[in-house]
């Protein structure tokens, strides 16, 4: 994605020399100040992308294969896996092309590299936006299934889910093209940050409300069976821990990237902000880590999906 200091990585590699051995240490910024820079080895970057790619391909394959998983909930999970797959795949492709250009194994004109960079930017940006949208869609779907359980199947139908999926993908592609075309405008970057915060607030509000309802339900069952208080207190602690992990992972993996965008608007020339800008590849790696974790949280916990996955893997052998 086009952002300060990193918006033309492919073009920069045409005339660059191979980078030094990746490290974690102090680097000097433009003002001479010392700052912490975490360099991500290309091998690690590609490895993370490959793990994410394999995981999410397995999720998409399992859902496509099992007709029992052709429901609105799994439709959103499948699209989340697809968007995470594209995030990882596009970053892997960009890294691989950069390495080939730097090694002289790939010869290309600047115009060709520019077009390739634009295509990768659109794929990366649109898939990132789609991933955030589908995380929100999954939260909304689960909320409706709990608070409108009796009407769930009439509210969330497969045709409506498909229309929502189509709308998310179309909007993600259109807005990503708009963002990339006007990436140097502060308003565009702020819109992205506001969108991230809106998704974070939406997920937090919905999941906290669901946790409160689950605790009320557990307390009702405890009173019905005349259980001791520690039983439902333990449930509440477990639910709170699960919620903290879910939202914590989301914030830790996505937050630094959007902090990066915010600082581009607020302090593009400040020495401290310049130090943070140097860690852009680390922020991308965290997003890929989120793409690795998403299947573990949303997909692999399903017994039906795990069973289908075993069948797929056994058949492949």
Swiss-Prot record:
Known glycosylation sites: 29
Domain of life: Eukaryota
Annotated membrane topology: Multi-pass membrane protein
Record-annotated disulphide pairs: none
Keyword Signal listed: no
SMART domains per the UniProt record, alphabetical: 7TM_GPCR_Srsx
Entry keyword annotation includes GTP-binding: no
Subunit comment: Interacts with MGRN1, but does not undergo MGRN1-mediated ubiquitination; this interaction competes with GNAS-binding and thus inhibits agonist-induced cAMP production. Interacts with OPN3; the interaction results in a decrease in MC1R-mediated cAMP signaling and ultimately a decrease in melanin production in melanocytes.
Function according to Swiss-Prot or TrEMBL: Receptor for MSH (alpha, beta and gamma) and ACTH. The activity of this receptor is mediated by G proteins which activate adenylate cyclase. Mediates melanogenesis, the production of eumelanin (black/brown) and phaeomelanin (red/yellow), via regulation of cAMP signaling in melanocytes.
Protein name as annotated: Melanocyte-stimulating hormone receptor
Lineage: Eukaryota, Metazoa, Chordata, Craniata, Vertebrata
């Amino acid at each position: 994605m086009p952002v300060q200091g990193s918006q033309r990585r492919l073009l920069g590699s045409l005339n660059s020399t191979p980078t030094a051995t990746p490290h974690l240490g102090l680097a000097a910024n433009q003002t001479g100040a010392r700052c912490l820079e975490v360099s991500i080895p290309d091998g690690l970057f590609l490895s993370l992308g490959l793990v994410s790619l394999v995981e999410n391909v397995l999720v998409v394959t399992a859902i496509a294969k099992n007709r029992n998983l052709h429901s609105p909930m799994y439709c959103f999970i499948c699209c989340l896996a697809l968007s995470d797959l594209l995030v990882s795949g596009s970053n892997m492709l960009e890294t691989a092309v950069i390495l080939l250009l730097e090694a002289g194994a790939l010869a290309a004109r600047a115009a060709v590299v520019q077009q390739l960079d634009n295509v990768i930017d659109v794929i990366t940006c649109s898939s990132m936006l789609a991933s955030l949208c589908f995380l929100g869609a999954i939260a909304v779907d689960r909320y409706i299934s709990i608070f409108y359980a009796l009407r769930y199947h009439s509210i969330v139908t497969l045709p409506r889910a498909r229309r929502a999926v189509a709308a998310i993908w179309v909007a993600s592609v259109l807005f990503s093209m708009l963002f990339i075309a006007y990436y140097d405008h502060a308003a565009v970057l702020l819109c992205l940050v506001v969108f991230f915060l809106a998704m974070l607030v939406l997920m937090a509000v919905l999941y906290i409300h669901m946790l409160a309802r689950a605790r009320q339900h557990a307390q009702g069952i405890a009173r019905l069976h005349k259980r001791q208080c520690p039983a439902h207190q333990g449930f509440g602690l477990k639910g709170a821990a699960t919620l903290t992990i879910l939202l914590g992972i989301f914030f830790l993996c996505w937050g630094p990237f959007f902090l990066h965008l915010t600082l581009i608007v607020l302090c593009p020339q400040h020495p401290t902000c310049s130090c943070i800008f140097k860690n852009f590849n680390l922020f991308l790696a965290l997003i890929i880590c989120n793409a690795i974790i998403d299947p573990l949280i949303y997909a692999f916990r399903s017994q039906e999906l795990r069973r289908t996955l075993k069948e797929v893997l056994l058949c492949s052998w």
